[in-house]
Design a protein with these regions (language model features):
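Glycine-rich phosphate-binding loop
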Residues: 63-86
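Glycine-rich phosphate/diphosphate-binding loop of Rossmann-like nucleotide-binding domains
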Residues: 8-55
Length: 86
């Protein structure tokens, strides 16, 4: 398929509260993923964005649960698991 992807309209969300939860492993890659998520959330005019780090990818689901219990509206989960690594 040649051409460009269609542009999707983004609804401003100034009241939204979003947590970006990232593994502390492979920060060189995770930091780029976090930056991309932050750019998208900024474009959507999200009111509150907090970045939280956890030791590894295994802890991300529990941290997401805590974020929702703390009244976050959404969670962006960022992690990288490589075969053979913790």
């Amino acid at each position: 398929m040649a051409g460009h992807a269609p542009r999707i309209g983004i609804t401003p969300l100034p009241q939204a509260k979003v947590a970006i939860i990232s593994s502390s492993w492979h920060l060189d890659i995770c930091n780029e993923l976090i930056a991309g998520a932050q750019r998208a959330l900024l474009e959507a005019q999200v009111g509150t964005v907090e970045v939280q780090f956890v030791p590894g990818s295994f802890e991300i689901p529990l941290a997401a649960q805590y974020a929702f219990e703390a009244d976050f509206d959404a969670v962006v989960a960022v992690g990288l698991v490589l075969k053979g690594e913790t």
